[in-house]
Amino acid sequence: MGRMFGTDGVRGVANTELTARIAYDLGRAGAYVLTEGAHKPKILVAKDTRISGDMLESALIAGILSVGAEAIVLGVVPTPAVAYLTRKYGADAGVMISASHNPVEYNGIKFFNDKGYKLSDELEDEIQRVIESDFEGVPSPTGTDLGRETIEVSALDDYIEFAKNTIPYSLKGLKIALDCANGAAYKSSVKAFRELGADVFVINDNPDGTNINENCGSTHPEELMEYVIKKKCDLGFAFDGDADRCLAVDEKGNLINGDFILMLCAKYLKELGKLKDDTLVVTVMSNLGLDIACKNEKINIVKTAVGDRYVLEEMVKNKYVLGGEQSGHVIFLDYNSTGDGLVTALQIAGIVKKKEKALSELCSIMKELPQVLANATIPNDKKDLYLTDDEIQNEIRKIEEALNGVGRVLIRPSGTEPLVRVMLEGENQAEIDEMAHNLANLIEKKYN
């Protein structure tokens, strides 16, 4: 078997690639590996709004109970709520059932340790090893030694209270639009903003099990962009399916991506003397415009591989407090141990309120270089072949020469889908658009 875990847990099409059997095995092996030696360990279990969540949750819980661990069921809450509540409740681990921004037919299972951090590669490999060994040495208790399932009814309110406490003042007077992606944010984000005094307008807050991320949320913010203008809001926020990321929309209906959000928050934290070593952690995918803006503001940048787990690793290692991705995964390490869409949205709203300036004006400190992303659909086992392919490497060199030092080419395999992503930045939008798609087509043609 290849590696089960991708960059964000185990993910696949529910009931074919990610079956109830796999969920049971992950529950059983995960509970064993993460709680070895603990007496009656506690594991939190949560999910987003996908129809397959019920099936996978039941199987996962069965696996957890089968090794004598307790399953504390949180219901539908955002991924960052699991990270926070694992610490708050003193649990031994937490599990989120979600495929984040992916379409409804997908689902995923990701684990958090007792500190609320995603697992290391080594721990994930150990969970897989236990499954592949057919659970050799894993206990199967009987009678009163089996685990019990309990429902934690205050989970959502405990998370909302935590998120609200990350900004110490009211948002009264702000008109805010929220796009909940028919996902895990549909209750928590609305309640938090309303309780802080904001005038809240909401779309896509009616999940039916099948409409998560469907033409809405952070992957499709167009509806929110129009809605902000229609309702004359000061700003808007679009979450993804599990609400661990968010994008913003300014009062003019312009999309504010993760790079702008990071720049805005870094500048504000630096002014308060709270940006450790005046340093921001981002990935290699961040726009070159962010580098330029940070240089102007005397903010240092540290770059990591793509994936919020690598951003987090760097932050934890050097105790940096702010980092994230262009996609809207933003980590405020003083508050939570993972990307948190609600906390991010509250910080932005707080800055707008405190500065008494429009979001468009606050974001004008950064100018974005045109950037194009093109996907090449290729089988998972061929995703790294471009690295040693002379024709493709030659094509990349040609593009780099044409960009003449103002721009770049970045190619990376997706960690969650059978795709290779081709990213180009440069001064001329039409030119880089053509180059990116030509290169993606070449890669796709060669490996299919």
Curated annotation (Swiss-Prot):
Any Pfam family: PGM_PMM_I
Catalytic site positions: 100
EC number(s) from the headed UniProt entry: 5.4.2.10
Segment forming the signal sequence: none
PTM sites of type Phosphoserine: 100
Binding residues annotated for Mg(2+), in chain numbering: 100, 240, 242, 244
Superkingdom in the source lineage: Bacteria
Record GO biological process: carbohydrate metabolic process; peptidoglycan biosynthetic process; UDP-N-acetylglucosamine biosynthetic process
GO molecular function per UniProt: magnesium ion binding; phosphoglucosamine mutase activity; phosphomannomutase activity
Keywords: Isomerase, Magnesium, Metal-binding, Phosphoprotein
Post-translational modification: Activated by phosphorylation.
Free-text cofactor note: Binds 1 Mg(2+) ion per subunit.
Catalytic activity of the protein: alpha-D-glucosamine 1-phosphate = D-glucosamine 6-phosphate
Cofactor needs: Mg(2+)
InterPro entries: A-D-PHexomutase_a/b/a-I, A-D-PHexomutase_a/b/a-I/II/III, A-D-PHexomutase_a/b/a-II, A-D-PHexomutase_a/b/a-III, A-D-PHexomutase_C, A-D-PHexomutase_C_sf, A-D-PHexomutase_CS, Alpha-D-phosphohexomutase_SF
CC terms in the record's Gene Ontology section: cytosol
Family matches, as PROSITE patterns: PGM_PMM
Keyword match Transcription regulation: no
Enzyme class at the top of the EC tree: isomerase
Function as written in the Swiss-Prot or TrEMBL entry: Catalyzes the conversion of glucosamine-6-phosphate to glucosamine-1-phosphate.
Family statement: Belongs to the phosphohexose mutase family.
Protein name stated in the entry: Phosphoglucosamine mutase
Organism this protein belongs to: Clostridium beijerinckii (strain ATCC 51743 / NCIMB 8052) (Clostridium acetobutylicum)
